[in-house]
Curated annotation (Swiss-Prot):
This is Large ribosomal subunit protein bL32. The keyword Ribonucleoprotein applies. It comes from Cronobacter sakazakii (strain ATCC BAA-894) (Enterobacter sakazakii). One of its GO terms (cellular component) is large ribosomal subunit. The gene is rpmF. Coiled coil: none annotated.
Length: 57
């Protein structure tokens, strides 16, 4: 098993973790038919996508 030679510094740990931060959702769309807000390229909670009903309950 691999064992580290020296303890990584706080700086190296921070540099490794610098890309792990969560980002806010910035790409929201409003459906033409229902006016509901949803993620882009996803259907709404009502089952609409690009103005069409794609899922019926």
């Amino acid at each position: 098993m691999a064992v580290q030679q020296n303890k990584p510094t706080r700086s190296k740990r921070g540099m490794r973790r610098s890309h792990d931060a969560l980002t806010a959702v910035t790409s929201l769309s409003v459906d033409k038919t229902s006016g509901e807000t949803h993620l882009r390229h996803h259907i709404t909670a009502d089952g609409y996508y690009r103005g069409r009903k794609v899922i019926t309950k």
